[in-house]
């Protein structure tokens, strides 16, 4: 692996084609307009990575990536990979619910273990608190090494309770990986006429798979090996995982598992935006630096649009805290779209149709200060365009918030928003 350390002056900048100043807030709902291409097609992906990604981030070139929408698209691909596994399966998830989807995955994992595949499953004890213990015990009896991340204990205090494993990683045979916002639960692929939670998963083949597997193994060993064993491993050279596989495509990816590095990647890309910043966030309670970066981008004439929950969130208190930011953001020219088809759970962003990120990181306090997270970050025109098209399509199922109408909301609603904003760090 080699870290790309391009200088800021080393990237030839071009005037964005078709760029437009931020318009006055639209009075009627409508899709986010497509402003066209920012970069010349001749600009290399390596130069784009140098421009949009902080210098300290290691970018792995040569990946093949596919964007999967909701569990309806992601689960069949994940299950097929598990059923084809021959050597190893690593599954890390916040929620492993013992419903129809959980049973389906459990059966596939157990069958893999029974045919000799080395299967490790790490689920978060709090995120999966409703799941039956007998389900996981049944997996163990069939050969699956399944363990809970930090079961709650009163003796360990609230800080231990807040530090959760929020990652979603599946790595099979060291050759294919999946990461994004989708857990293992029927929320993302309901039976009958139910509406799936809106989310995204990135399927990866290539050198970046190694990095996701390495992150999984580091967490596993941190949690379940004694201190002496961990010390010996550090002396021998750290966490081992299969060497990176051959190149499968042309996408450069950085795998970020530090909370601060993910936050820094967001800020860096927004500050360098030239035409558009499109963020889909199921949970959005931004810190001051992110608010300032978004407002500054809008003042520069960059199109800034947010896709947020619209009254159907699984965390309604957090949604009220989010609305405390609306006037400030819309007053700066930022457009806000509220998702109307069920729960929005996505954690994606795309800048200039080039830089993008998909992962588990939410733009709120728990992800920034406590949780274990992982995001894939890329600078690729094809994948960026695909993510941007998905965002713009989703806006067709949204209600755009009108600033004048929003200001006339009831006084009690304003009071609730302010109170919950005050407690935003613990929601």
Locations of the language-model features?
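Charged, low-complexity intrinsically disordered terminal segments
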Residues: 2-5, 10, 14-427
